[in-house]
């Protein structure tokens, strides 16, 4: 696989996702980091996004709820280069009916090399990093070259 670069702008497009048992933890984290987050564009799966808006007043572009296709919608945005980083508080102790969607979402975040926090400590590191407020170059798959190679 060949790679190219993509610039993540100073104003980030951030996906916020949380499993049911982790929603309160994400809400608490968003509340604590509201000042940093208000400078960025927020996206979320359905229930999580609506809870964030109701509890913090921050504008959130909400997808469908995760089990109804919201995880896949966020994954599509990642593949299109429209999400720059993801905060995903997932529940490692309880299976969810849409586990394959969750795995696919995390796989796409890895393929497209976006920063991902799956717990509060890592999320804190991301928002407190100097890179959180600056443009950042990341390596991403060169899809055009990938497609050309496959069509030979």
Curated annotation (Swiss-Prot):
Residues in coiled coil:
none
Record's protein name: Methylglyoxal synthase
**What is the gene called?**
mgsA
Q: Where is the active site?
A: 71
One GO MF annotation is:
methylglyoxal synthase activity
Tell me its family: Belongs to the methylglyoxal synthase family.
**Which InterPro entries is this protein grouped with?**
Methylgl_synth (IPR004363), Methylglyoxal_synth_AS (IPR018148), MGS-like_dom (IPR011607), MGS-like_dom_sf (IPR036914)
Give the top-rank taxon of the lineage listed in the UniProt record for this protein.
Answer: Bacteria
Q: Is Lyase among this UniProt entry's keywords?
A: yes
Mention one GO biological process in which this protein takes part, according to its record: methylglyoxal biosynthetic process
- State the GO CC annotations: cytosol
The keyword Lyase appears for this protein: yes
**Keyword set for this entry?**
Lyase
- What does the UniProt function comment say about this protein? Catalyzes the formation of methylglyoxal from dihydroxyacetone phosphate.
Domain (MGS-like): give its ranges.
6-152
- Catalytic activity, reaction form: dihydroxyacetone phosphate = methylglyoxal + phosphate
């Amino acid at each position: 696989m060949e790679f190219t670069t993509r610039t993540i702008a100073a104003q980030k497009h951030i996906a916020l996702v949380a499993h049911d048992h982790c929603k309160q933890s994400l809400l608490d984290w968003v509340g604590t980091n509201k000042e940093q987050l208000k400078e960025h564009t927020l996206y979320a799966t359905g229930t999580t996004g609506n809870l964030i808006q109701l509890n913090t007043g921050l504008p959130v572009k909400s997808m469908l709820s995760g089990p109804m296709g919201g995880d896949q919608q966020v994954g599509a945005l990642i593949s299109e280069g429209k999400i720059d980083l993801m905060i995903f508080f997932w529940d490692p102790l309880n299976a969810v009916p849409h586990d394959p969607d969750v795995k696919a979402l995390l796989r796409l975040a890895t393929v497209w090399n976006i920063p991902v926090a799956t717990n509060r400590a890592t999320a804190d590191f991301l928002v407190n990093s100097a890179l959180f407020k600056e443009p950042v170059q990341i390596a991403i798959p060169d899809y055009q070259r990938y497609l050309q190679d496959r069509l030979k």
